[in-house]
Amino acid sequence: MNLDYFKILFFKLTLERFPNIFRPTSSPYISGDGFRKISDHIFDESCTLDPNKINFNDIVFLNPELADIYFSNFHNQVSNKYYLVTHNSNIEIGKYIEKYIDEKIIHWFALNLDLNHPKATLIPYGLENLRRLRYGRKEWFKSKKFLKSENYVLASFDIFKNYDEREPILEILKNNKLVKFNKFSSKREYFYNLKSFKFLICPIGQGYDTSRIWEGLLCGVYPILKLNEHSKILKEIGLPAIYLEDWNDLNNYDKQAFNDFYTKFKNTKEFNINSFTHWKEKFKLLKSNY
């Protein structure tokens, strides 16, 4: 093994041990650490906050793994109304919104949103945080030249991230000639090949949302999603994707159907929910107009 390997290994181990050392955004792309960066206060595995310093209209970033601690010990000490952002966790957030939202929270922006609430808005997973130095590296998305071949649907996922949900997909679609089940030896190989497909199967993993959805869109590849409480919201807000009641339904689509979907999605106006600039401007507007 060469010296560079050990340098990278040391760097990764250091980042895991000291999570506040390296927290870059993925701008111009979305990531959890991007939302974290544009917040006024942070309460997560590496930062705490002073509730007395939360001013009217401020944005608080919360890792929902710590939601019970935050709401039991900090939120009740806040005297001003504020915006809440929850990200960087696989937790289904609906139960916490129902339990904790009150008049002090002007609006709650949430990853893995799984209910409709007038004071809650879905925010995307986006890319894996850049600090992981894996799938979220910006170099994978710089090229906008997508050379589409006769590859229609890619299925490339780790079934052990959610075995009960993902393993049946292999059996259901194993004879579908338009679906390619591929494993890749590196991230570079994955993204190079991904760009040649039109659609990407995106089953839920450890949480409802997954970086796979947003990586695919940045590569000109549209997600195929099974309907659930989270993906129903994505459908409502107009995310270009094929939505299925059951994975078996995918076996009813032929090449013409996929081509029709692909043409329709390509001709749809740009979907700004996948733009970090959109969210920065939205938050800036909220803070100035409330």
Where are these regions (language model features)?
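Nucleotide-sugar donor-binding catalytic core of glycosyltransferases
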Residues: N2-W214, Y222-L239, F261-K287
